Swiss-Prot record:
Ligand binding (GTP): 167-174, 192-196, 214-217, 284-287, 319-321
Entry annotated with the keyword GTP-binding: yes
Gene that encodes it: obg
Record-stated family: Belongs to the TRAFAC class OBG-HflX-like GTPase superfamily. OBG GTPase family.
EC number assigned by the record: 3.6.5.-
Species in which this protein is naturally found: Streptococcus pyogenes serotype M28 (strain MGAS6180)
Main enzyme class: hydrolase
Keyword set, alphabetical order: Cytoplasm, GTP-binding, Hydrolase, Magnesium, Metal-binding, Nucleotide-binding
Annotated positions binding Mg(2+): S174, T194
SUPFAM superfamilies: Obg GTP-binding protein C-terminal domain, Obg GTP-binding protein N-terminal domain, P-loop containing nucleoside triphosphate hydrolases
Protein name per UniProt: GTPase Obg
Alphabetized HAMAP family for the sequence: GTPase_Obg (MF_01454)
Superkingdom in the source lineage: Bacteria
Length: 437
């Protein structure tokens, strides 16, 4: 039996863009033959793709770092470098992807074949053909490739099931699933026999079919982490109908109605509108002594909690072991599913806006100036750092171009206002230069 894993932490890094090239062709009467260096290729992106054949995040237990390839460098004759292939990472249906740093949901992957770009590959650097002007027909300038995006992610799998079985341990959830579907969950006469969710396809006599999940037993305090805690409550979130299984024989010495109230309290505490999902009460083990009397007492207590105009939850007496009452239960479940819409786990405010996620929604801060203990001025900022890493510091013309870009951004003036003097050291990353006033 394969291990089940429903959470994982991974890192993804898109490929860097290829560097642009400085090259010249040989042609009579053309300065230096004219520029002939091509652009670098685009870096590969990291893309998540849903594969309905996957049932767990187990693959991410052993492989936690995903890095796409970089684009090729530009070439002579103005030829562009080859762009790198995107890295496709397969995930199971029902995978929620969060940014580990912010906790924000990036995407919720539920459809087979659905794809989302998780980290964008860097743009290829421009070759010197791109920088030719009438004033400078033979530029010795080319850009380095742009770094690819890199981020830490949290993956969370919430299995896709139409119907979820909830209840205390050993109330018969696994037995019920095993007799109404082809699923083969582990069944035992002890608590927490089921320690992973089990999924089975159910087909009714009338031809309706739906997916049913047997979830590990809940106990009081599960929403605060008691027992198996919230690690399996998450799997209830995608269900449309809840079958609340209760041991009506009270074989564990608990009161069936108190079990019902306790489990509902846990669902409500966990939140995410779980109590908005329609419930069917499954009175199991009705073939056992005292079950009929317990059911009468249960119905009386339940009715006392509702107004006369409220609709009481449906109750179906069954015995999974004796295969009694199952047909009526399944037909009613299918009918309820047919008129119950899906529940959205995340509204638009929960999801990271795609434009904001990729840094285009609002104007980014161009630069920031701080001062180290050694009196060195330190420049930082997304735009400034991106320009820096794409500048070829081995060529004088590229350095001069970068200096003009800084001046155009107002860096020189800002340094003067902060008190920078001629000859002061300025640092960007690990690169240092002297401030010239």
């Amino acid at each position: 039996m394969s291990m089940f894993l429903d959470t994982a932490k991974i890192s993804v890094q898109a490929g860097r863009g290829g560097d642009g090239m400085v090259a010249f062709r040989r042609e009579k009467y053309v300065p230096n033959g004219g520029p002939w260096g091509g652009d670098g290729g685009k870096g590969g992106s990291v893309i998540f793709r849903v594969n309905e054949g996957l049932r767990t995040l187990m693959d991410f237990r052993y492989n936690r770092k995903f890095k796409a390839k970089s684009g090729e460098k530009g070439m002579t004759k103005g030829m562009h470098g080859r762009g790198a292939e995107d890295l496709i990472v397969f995930v199971p249906q029902g995978t929620t992807v969060r940014d580990a740093e912010t906790g924000k949901v990036i995407t919720d992957l539920v459809e087979h074949g659905q794809e989302v770009v998780i980290a964008k590959g860097g743009r290829g650097g421009r070759g010197n053909i791109r920088f030719a002007t009438p004033r400078n027909p033979a530029p010795e300038i080319a850009e380095n490739g742009e770094p690819g995006e890199e981020r830490q992610l949290e993956l969370e799998l919430k299995i896709l099931a139409d119907v979820g079985l909830v209840g205390f341990p050993s109330v018969g959830k696994s037995t019920l699933l095993s007799v109404v579907s082809s699923a083969k969950p582990k069944i035992g006469a002890y608590h927490f026999t089921t320690i992973v969710p089990n999924l089975g396809m159910v087909r009714t006599k009338s031809g309706d079919s739906f997916a049913m999940a047997d979830l590990p037993g809940l106990i009081e305090g599960a929403s605060q982490g008691v027992g198996l805690g919230t690690q399996f409550l998450r799997h209830i979130e995608r269900t449309r109908v809840i079958l609340h299984v209760i041991d009506m024989s009270a074989s564990e010495g608990r009161d069936p109605y108190e079990d019902y109230v306790s489990i509902n309290n846990e669902l409500e505490t966990y939140n995410l509108r779980l109590m908005e999902r329609p419930q069917i009460i499954v009175a199991n083990k009705m073939d056992m002594p005292e079950a009929q009397e317990n059911l009468k007492a249960f119905k009386k207590k339940l009715a006392a909690q509702y107004d006369e105009f409220d609709d009481l939850p449906m109750i179906f007496p069954i015995s999974s072991l004796a295969h009694q009452g199952l047909e009526n239960l399944l037909e009613a479940t299918a009918e309820l599913l047919a008129k119950t819409d899906e529940f959205l786990l995340y509204d638009e405010s929960d999801l990271v806006d795609e434009e904001a996620y990729y840094g285009f929604a609002e104007a980014e801060k161009e630069f920031e100036i701080t001062r180290d203990d050694d009196a060195t001025w330190v420049l930082s900022g997304e735009k400034l750092e991106r320009l820096f890493v794409m500048t070829n510091m081995e060529r004088d013309e590229s350095i001069m171009k970068f200096a003009r870009q800084l001046r155009g951004m107002g860096v020189d003036e800002a340094l003067r206002e902060r008190g920078a003097k001629d000859g002061d050291l300025v640092r960007i990353g690990k690169f240092e230069f002297e401030f010239v006033d």
